[in-house]
């Protein structure tokens, strides 16, 4: 059965064809060919007919999911062309053998790994959904959604998926999504200064903030340039050989931890959740690398401890939309809205300080200090503008080569996304977790964190020839979170004890004064 999608075209998109944006063209370059993959766990059995009917009524109404990629004979001009969509062709329901059900977690990892090796069919819209009747340790059934990155970034894709979901507690209500405008430290400073300080002091603050912003932006721009030209990360056990990465098989693993533990740390340390996640990631990487270097020491019978000066940097993805959180599809597609569908993100080079520390809270403090400086900069916006200019002036091949070189000189990719705060259902099927990430870029390690309800899911995509034990890396991440939580709890206990001691001393002093007064009166 075919569905004609043209009647769903909005007034702003009556054109049958639309050219690819510079970012979308980059994602189709041979150096990248990036895809987004999301493993979704469900509480109940999946009904393929219900999903197909739901996709017909909602999902394919979006132009990008009812358009195919068309390339000219010379391969230079690429465009989206609206087409008829046979929804059933995009659904895959594999037959799973009984022996695979016994070790379902390993089978799911192998299935997703094989799926990441197969390119999407460009003769139809670039997405597909796999429905697996497979019970795993944390889900009754599993779905795997695969979408080409040229269709949109993670924020766009998630907004569309969530627009198709409903609250489990109220099937008629859309998920409650965080919707907060960015409030940088510099903007709050200027607002506060304009209200309470004199004009001269406020002017000094404005000038000082502008100077710091400019210096940080220049530093980030120079870091981008030198990284592209010659500055490479240390050859650690998690940095891959990117010349042959495309021929290697990737693996996706995930681990779910308590979001309440992260919030407890956030509140105690006066940080954001993103600060805590970066700090825990830094601690987990340090712990994992220390083990890997120790194993090599045992194997080679040579002293090879964790080096003191390791340059390990991440390409940290930054959402450039003027609002934070995941915007619902209606807001994102509304005419005049500041939120737009597509690939609207830049990235900054984020250095992780790799070391084993006696106080695990130092990892949080270092990460917060670094990311605070990165936030007070237009470095991410500059990378976005730079990519667009290079694509237009020098062509997609030169631009892809430059970006590929810059990314290859770093070690990993990191991203973080906020999810629904309550349980949601996908066409009537309650969801237990989202494990999403992207692949195709030249990194042996990609870490993506996504919150959902009171949980945080950490998803790793690794090159198994470089990181053969990704579950141990997940263990180190989780153990680092536990040690940081324990340190925070201990600090809070000591702080409470100090408060009680001060209170005790003051009460004792007060009683002494009262006793002295009574003695004199008598």
Swiss-Prot record:
- List of catalytic residues: 149
Q: Glycosylation: which residues?
A: 270, 409
UniProt keywords, alphabetically: Acyltransferase, Cell membrane, Endoplasmic reticulum, Glycoprotein, Membrane, Stress response, Transferase, Transmembrane, Transmembrane helix
Q: Which GO terms describe its molecular function?
A: diacylglycerol O-acyltransferase activity; long-chain-alcohol O-fatty-acyltransferase activity
Transmembrane annotation, as ranges: 206-226
Q: Under the cellular component aspect of Gene Ontology, which terms does the record hold?
A: endoplasmic reticulum membrane; plasma membrane
Q: Which reaction does it catalyse?
A: an acyl-CoA + a 1,2-diacyl-sn-glycerol = a triacyl-sn-glycerol + CoA; a long chain fatty alcohol + a fatty acyl-CoA = a wax ester + CoA
Name of this protein = Wax ester synthase/diacylglycerol acyltransferase 4
Q: Which organism is it from?
A: Arabidopsis thaliana (Mouse-ear cress)
- Gene coding for it: WSD4
């Amino acid at each position: 059965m075919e569905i004609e999608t043209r009647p769903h075209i909005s007034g702003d998109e009556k054109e049958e064809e639309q050219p690819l944006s510079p970012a979308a063209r980059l994602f189709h370059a041979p150096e990248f060919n990036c895809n987004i993959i999301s493993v979704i766990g469900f509480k109940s059995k999946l009904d393929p007919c219900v999903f197909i009917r739901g996709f017909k009524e909602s999902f394919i109404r979006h132009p990008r999911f009812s358009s195919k990629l068309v390339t000219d004979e010379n391969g230079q001009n690429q465009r989206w062309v609206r087409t008829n969509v046979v929804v059933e062709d995009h659904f895959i329901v594999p037959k799973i053998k009984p022996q695979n059900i016994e070790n379902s977690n390993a089978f799911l990892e192998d299935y997703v790994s094989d799926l990441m090796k197969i390119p999407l069919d460009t003769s139809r819209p670039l997405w597909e959904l796999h429905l697996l009747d497979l019970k795993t340790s944390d889900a009754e059934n599993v779905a795997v959604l695969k979408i080409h990155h040229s269709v949109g970034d993670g924020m766009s894709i998630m907004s569309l998926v969530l627009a198709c979901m409903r609250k489990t507690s109220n099937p008629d209500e859309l998920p409650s999504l965080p919707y907060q405008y960015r409030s940088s430290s510099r903007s709050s400073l200027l607002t506060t200064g304009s209200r309470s300080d004199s004009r001269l002091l406020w002017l000094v603050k404005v000038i000082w903030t502008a100077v710091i912003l400019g210096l940080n932006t220049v530093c980030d721009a120079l870091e981008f340039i030198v990284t592209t030209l010659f500055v490479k990360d240390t050859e650690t056990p998690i940095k891959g050989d990117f010349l042959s990465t495309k021929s290697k098989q990737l693996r996706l693993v995930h681990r779910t931890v308590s979001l309440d533990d992260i919030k407890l740390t956030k509140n105690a340390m006066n940080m954001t959740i993103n600060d805590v996640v970066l700090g825990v990631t830094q601690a987990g990487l340090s712990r994992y690398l220390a083990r890997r270097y120790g194993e090599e020491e045992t194997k080679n019978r040579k002293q090879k401890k964790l080096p003191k000066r390791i340059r390990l940097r991440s390409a940290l993805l930054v959402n450039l939309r003027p609002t934070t959180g995941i915007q619902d599809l209606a807001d994102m597609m509304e005419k005049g809205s500041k939120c737009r569908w597509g690939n609207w993100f830049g990235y900054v080079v984020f250095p992780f300080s790799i070391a084993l520390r006696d106080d695990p809270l130092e990892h949080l403090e270092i990460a917060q200090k670094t990311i605070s400086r990165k936030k007070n900069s237009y470095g991410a916006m500059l990378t976005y503008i730079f990519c667009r200019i290079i694509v237009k002036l020098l062509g997609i091949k030169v631009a892809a080569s430059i970006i590929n070189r810059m990314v290859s000189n770093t070690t990993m990719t990191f991203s973080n996304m906020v999810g629904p705060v309550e349980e949601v259902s996908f066409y009537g099927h309650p969801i237990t977790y989202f494990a999403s990430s992207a692949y195709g870029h030249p990194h042996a390690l990609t870490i993506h964190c996504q919150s959902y309800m009171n949980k945080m899911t950490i998803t790793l995509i690794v090159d198994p020839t470089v990181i053969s034990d990704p579950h141990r890396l997940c263990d180190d991440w989780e153990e680092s979170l536990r040690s940081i939580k324990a340190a925070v709890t201990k600090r809070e206990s000591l702080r409470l004890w100090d408060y009680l001691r001060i209170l005790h001393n003051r009460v004792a002093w007060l009683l002494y004064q009262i006793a002295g007064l009574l003695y004199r009166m008598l």
